[in-house]
Every structure is written in C-alpha cells, then in structure tokens.
C-alpha cells in the first residue's frame, strides 16, 4: 500500500514539475533577451582622453584605481601611496570617533584625500579619487542632515515628486560634505525577509 502511495506522489511530483518547466520555458522564450540591448555609443573625445592617460599610468596606479578603501581604515598618505581610485565612507565610518560628523570635519577629510590623490610626486600623472558613501535614504552620517524612510517605504508612497525632492535634498547634503558619489537609489529584491533592506 505504501508503495502505491509513494508511486502516486512521485508521479504527481513529476507531473507538476513538468508543467512548471514547460510554463517557465514558454515564459522565458517570450522575453526579449538582454543581448538585444545596445551599448551606449562611445564618445570620441572621452576615448581620446583615455588613450592619452592610460599609457602614463604605472601598473601600481592602474591597480590602485580599481581599489576602494573605507575612510575609517586609511589616511591621506595611504591614498597617495597606493593611488586609490575611490574611498568609501561606509556605515558608521565618519571622520572622528563618532558614526557621524559635522560638515567641516567631512570637508577636511575629503580635501585631504583629494589633495593626496592629485599629488604628482613620483608619478607622471595623477587621477583624482572619488569619495563615495551609502546615502540610500539621506546622509545619515552628517550631523544635522535629514534621514528619510528607507526606499521600500518611499516607494510605498507612490509619489515620484516626493522621492525626487528627497533625492535633491540628499544630493545637496552630500555635496556639502564633499562626497561625489552615493550608492543610491537602490532597487532591492530581497530573497530573505531577515535582510535589513526588506522593510
């Protein structure tokens, strides 16, 4: 008796799996493949500038350009020595002992990193670094800045004008603190609701 029940369950499972496979196969075949996307056209002026700069960089500089260090673990001297391409102000890594700092402290740090990155001592050419930060819902590491709800909450408002205004305010606060780049907006598709950005 158990053998018959087992075989029926196996047969049902195979049948359901076959239906799912056929459904998924048909679904994916109706989708436009990513390969149909065309890359953006190259800008000849930018390409010429790249062709001029690359031969002037040492191997060490080229390696440094693809490294992003966290500002809490490096100094301006490190930026110059290793010719870093970017510095991340990661979570809770503001200048100083606190997880946030005032605009003056941020600018002092940003300027020190920038000046170190453009120092041409010992190299033919220097490339300015990019200072990045996680400001997905406001500049939480800037004293006095506005921190907004996370993107999932903002999306739930269904108000693109509000979200645009929040982005404008965040961009202003990042500029005031010397940052060039934020890792935002984010489109998160969590597979596990325990992940912090799923709320």
Residue ranges, per PLM feature:
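N-terminal beta-rich core of secreted/periplasmic extracellular enzymes
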Residues: 29-199
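Bacterial N-terminal signal peptides that target proteins for export
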Residues: 2-14
